[in-house]
């Protein structure tokens, strides 16, 4: 099996860091809610608190990795400019999308979302992690702050989900191609 270098980076960005982030979001929201909602102390609040801190830090790393790889590794390939008079735009995803009225929306809405709004994901989850690390289980005594943390966590999840949807659709219609070929596994000759 073969994959190009650019397709590999796209896979790492979307399915690796982005996909894991989306999977982790639901667990984080439930964990934050359970740890900060109850007025009674649980059996082991310090152990749970430590776990949620580590979990949130891992989410921060996933979110920043996805956004930074998307912005500084994949996006320049997406925006590559074709030479004058080029007819085959398959190596120039942005121009391929913009060349068709049926697909221009994937660039004008989808990629614009990914370029700008997707940055909200790591920023908001970093805020959530910072506030939780600062207040921990005591966050239950600060209802407005607790509500803000949960809302920002949910908003981060929604923004990441929409960015993931647009990324998958853009990759389906105009994938980032090129680069050296990576061999995955060995092929036997018959």
Residue map of PLM features:
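Polytopic transmembrane helical bundles with strong interfacial aromatic enrichment
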Residues: 1-190
């Amino acid at each position: 099996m073969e994959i190009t270098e650019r397709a590999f980076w796209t896979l790492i960005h979307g399915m690796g860091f982005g996909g894991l982030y989306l999977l982790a979001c639901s667990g984080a929201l439930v964990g934050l809610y359970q740890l900060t909602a109850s007025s009674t102390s649980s059996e082991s609040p310090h152990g749970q608190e430590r776990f949620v801190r580590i979990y949130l830090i891992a989410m921060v790393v996933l979110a920043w990795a996805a956004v930074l790889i998307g912005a500084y590794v994949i996006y320049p390939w997406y925006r590559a400019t074709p030479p004058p008079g080029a007819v085959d735009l398959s190596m120039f995803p942005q121009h391929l999308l913009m060349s068709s009225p049926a697909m221009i929306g994937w660039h004008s809405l989808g990629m614009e979302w990914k370029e700008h709004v997707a940055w909200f994901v790591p920023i908001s989850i970093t805020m959530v992690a910072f506030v939780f690390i600062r207040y921990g289980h005591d966050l239950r005594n600060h209802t407005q702050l607790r509500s803000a943390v949960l809302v920002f966590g949910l908003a981060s999840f929604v923004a990441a989900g929409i960015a993931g949807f647009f990324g998958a659709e853009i990759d389906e219609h105009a994938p980032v191609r090129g680069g050296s070929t990576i061999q995955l596994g060995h092929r036997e000759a018959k």
